[in-house]
């Protein structure tokens, strides 16, 4: 789950970390009031969406008058902002962050993330901040520095010093950085984050180090114990189908194909998608209804899949281990009738009471195709979606 920039900075401030002074606003007048409260002669107005590339898309503006703050906020609020990192129709801007400007001398990059290879937290830094770090890593990988953290010790002093020297920091900036990095690590661990990215981390003209921007992603699997963070979820920033899946407590990822998939188990779901590709088709989604699938979750799955207008067929692949296939078959029949499914439905059942489940489907009087194998199911789905 992603946080907005203003929310991420609130998390930092709650841990006694310094950030630029800023106020979130949901209206143009509130933005103008925020600028007055902050004082000064210039402000930055930032659109709050869950995507990078806001600056190039016109979502970050430096202005020098209260009237300009109001007009920029009015131009952003209530409208979608399209960037290189989001969908073609963009994401809606419901909030802007009005911040003080800073006298910037240098822009750096700093992030903490889960490194899957080492199964530890990695600190990634670069002197080439303020730009797309992926491009920097691709074109000049030597400019990207990485330190792997011991989970028992966290970020150690020698690692802070090594990164600070490599980034060319000295004096107060060096001290600030070496204080900041262990604090960020503690924030990362204490909040079950999967990503904490500061781009840019700026060095000011008076040699202070501050996070000018901040992105946080919380591990979805830890939200049950991070209620304060879970309450910050903004479903307007994610795909409508994924928002519905969150509400139904099923795992859904939208894809670009036209064959809807509903499977119990993530591994089986990926194998199903692979077979669809091998048969020349393209899955429209990843949807895992879980090992303990019920008729209710099957009905919810249908509703979520059919929110995608590109879906031309639905493939259901259920292995009856914990759950009985006849119970799932009854749920499928109920869901098809309830939802009013108008696209072909192909079902592959295997496991406990699979034969009884297939019999129930055959006797339902509905246009449901019962496949004998996963390969056959994938082939039928591709043919029906063509």
Swiss-Prot record:
<dbReference type="GO" id="GO:0005524">
    <property type="term" value="F:ATP binding"/>
</dbReference>
<dbReference type="GO" id="GO:0005829">
    <property type="term" value="C:cytosol"/>
</dbReference>
<dbReference type="InterPro" id="IPR013650">
    <property type="entry name" value="ATP-grasp_succ-CoA_synth-type"/>
</dbReference>
<keyword id="KW-0460">Magnesium</keyword>
<keyword id="KW-0479">Metal-binding</keyword>
<dbReference type="InterPro" id="IPR016102">
    <property type="entry name" value="Succinyl-CoA_synth-like"/>
</dbReference>
<feature type="binding site">
    <location>
        <position position="213"/>
    </location>
    <ligand>
        <name>Mg(2+)</name>
    </ligand>
</feature>
<dbReference type="GO" id="GO:0006104">
    <property type="term" value="P:succinyl-CoA metabolic process"/>
</dbReference>
<protein>
    <recommendedName>
        <fullName>Succinate--CoA ligase [ADP-forming] subunit beta</fullName>
        <ecNumber>6.2.1.5</ecNumber>
    </recommendedName>
</protein>
<dbReference type="Pfam" id="PF08442">
    <property type="entry name" value="ATP-grasp_2"/>
</dbReference>
<dbReference type="GO" id="GO:0000287">
    <property type="term" value="F:magnesium ion binding"/>
</dbReference>
<keyword id="KW-0436">Ligase</keyword>
<feature type="binding site">
    <location>
        <position position="102"/>
    </location>
    <ligand>
        <name>ATP</name>
    </ligand>
</feature>
<keyword id="KW-0547">Nucleotide-binding</keyword>
<dbReference type="InterPro" id="IPR013815">
    <property type="entry name" value="ATP_grasp_subdomain_1"/>
</dbReference>
<comment type="subunit">
    <text>Heterotetramer of two alpha and two beta subunits.</text>
</comment>
<dbReference type="GO" id="GO:0004775">
    <property type="term" value="F:succinate-CoA ligase (ADP-forming) activity"/>
</dbReference>
<keyword id="KW-0816">Tricarboxylic acid cycle</keyword>
<feature type="binding site">
    <location>
        <position position="199"/>
    </location>
    <ligand>
        <name>Mg(2+)</name>
    </ligand>
</feature>
<feature type="binding site">
    <location>
        <position position="99"/>
    </location>
    <ligand>
        <name>ATP</name>
    </ligand>
</feature>
<keyword id="KW-0067">ATP-binding</keyword>
<feature type="binding site">
    <location>
        <position position="264"/>
    </location>
    <ligand>
        <name>substrate</name>
    </ligand>
</feature>
<feature type="binding site">
    <location>
        <position position="46"/>
    </location>
    <ligand>
        <name>ATP</name>
    </ligand>
</feature>
<dbReference type="GO" id="GO:0042709">
    <property type="term" value="C:succinate-CoA ligase complex"/>
</dbReference>
<dbReference type="GO" id="GO:0004776">
    <property type="term" value="F:succinate-CoA ligase (GDP-forming) activity"/>
</dbReference>
<feature type="binding site">
    <location>
        <begin position="53"/>
        <end position="55"/>
    </location>
    <ligand>
        <name>ATP</name>
    </ligand>
</feature>
<dbReference type="InterPro" id="IPR011761">
    <property type="entry name" value="ATP-grasp"/>
</dbReference>
<dbReference type="InterPro" id="IPR005811">
    <property type="entry name" value="SUCC_ACL_C"/>
</dbReference>
<feature type="binding site">
    <location>
        <position position="107"/>
    </location>
    <ligand>
        <name>ATP</name>
    </ligand>
</feature>
<comment type="similarity">
    <text>Belongs to the succinate/malate CoA ligase beta subunit family.</text>
</comment>
<dbReference type="Pfam" id="PF00549">
    <property type="entry name" value="Ligase_CoA"/>
</dbReference>
<dbReference type="GO" id="GO:0006099">
    <property type="term" value="P:tricarboxylic acid cycle"/>
</dbReference>
<dbReference type="InterPro" id="IPR005809">
    <property type="entry name" value="Succ_CoA_ligase-like_bsu"/>
</dbReference>
<comment type="function">
    <text>Succinyl-CoA synthetase functions in the citric acid cycle (TCA), coupling the hydrolysis of succinyl-CoA to the synthesis of either ATP or GTP and thus represents the only step of substrate-level phosphorylation in the TCA. The beta subunit provides nucleotide specificity of the enzyme and binds the substrate succinate, while the binding sites for coenzyme A and phosphate are found in the alpha subunit.</text>
</comment>
<dbReference type="InterPro" id="IPR017866">
    <property type="entry name" value="Succ-CoA_synthase_bsu_CS"/>
</dbReference>
<feature type="binding site">
    <location>
        <begin position="321"/>
        <end position="323"/>
    </location>
    <ligand>
        <name>substrate</name>
    </ligand>
</feature>
<feature type="domain" description="ATP-grasp">
    <location>
        <begin position="9"/>
        <end position="244"/>
    </location>
</feature>
<comment type="pathway">
    <text>Carbohydrate metabolism; tricarboxylic acid cycle; succinate from succinyl-CoA (ligase route): step 1/1.</text>
</comment>
């Amino acid at each position: 789950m992603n946080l907005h920039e203003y929310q991420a900075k609130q998390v930092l401030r709650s841990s006694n970390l310094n950030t630029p002074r800023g106020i979130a606003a949901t209206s143009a007048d509130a933005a103008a009031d925020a600028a007055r409260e902050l004082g000064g002669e210039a402000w930055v107005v930032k659109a709050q969406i869950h995507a990078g590339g806001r600056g190039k898309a016109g979502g970050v503006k430096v202005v020098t008058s209260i009237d300009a703050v109001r007009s920029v906020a009015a131009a952003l609020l209530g409208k979608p902002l399209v960037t290189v990192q989001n969908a073609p129709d963009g994401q809606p801007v419901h909030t802007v962050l009005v911040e003080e400007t800073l006298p910037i001398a240098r822009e750096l990059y700093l992030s903490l993330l889960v490194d899957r290879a080492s199964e530890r937290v990695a600190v990634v830094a670069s002197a080439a901040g303020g730009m797309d770090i992926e491009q920097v890593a691709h074109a000049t990988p030597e400019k990207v520095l990485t330190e792997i953290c011991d989970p028992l010790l966290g970020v150690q002093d020698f690692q802070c010093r090594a990164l600070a020297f490599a980034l060319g920091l000295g004096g107060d900036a060096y001290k600030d950085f070496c204080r900041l990095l262990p604090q960020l690590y503690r924030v990362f661990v204490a909040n079950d984050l999967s990503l904490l990215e500061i781009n840019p981390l700026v060095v000011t003209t008076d040699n202070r180090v501050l996070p000018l921007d901040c992105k946080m992603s919380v591990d979805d699997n830890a939200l049950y114990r991070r209620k304060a963070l879970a309450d910050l979820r903004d479903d307007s920033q994610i795909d409508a189908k994924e928002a519905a899946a969150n509400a139904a407590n099923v795992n859904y990822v939208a894809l670009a194909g036209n064959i809807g998939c509903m499977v119990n188990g993530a591994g089986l779901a990926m194998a199903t998608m692979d077979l669809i590709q091998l048969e020349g088709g393209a899955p429209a989604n990843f949807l895992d209804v879980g090992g303990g699938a019920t008729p209710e979750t099957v009905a919810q799955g249908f509703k979520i899949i059919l929110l995608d207008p590109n879906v031309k067929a639905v493939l259901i692949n259920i292995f009856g281990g914990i759950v009985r296939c006849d119970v799932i078959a009854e749920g499928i029949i109920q869901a098809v009738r309830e939802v009013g499914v108008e696209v072909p439905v192909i079902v592959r059942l295997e496991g406990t009471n699979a034969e009884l489940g297939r019999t129930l489907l055959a006797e339902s009087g509905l246009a449901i195709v019962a496949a004998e194998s996963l390969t056959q199911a994938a082939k039928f789905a591709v043919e029906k979606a063509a």
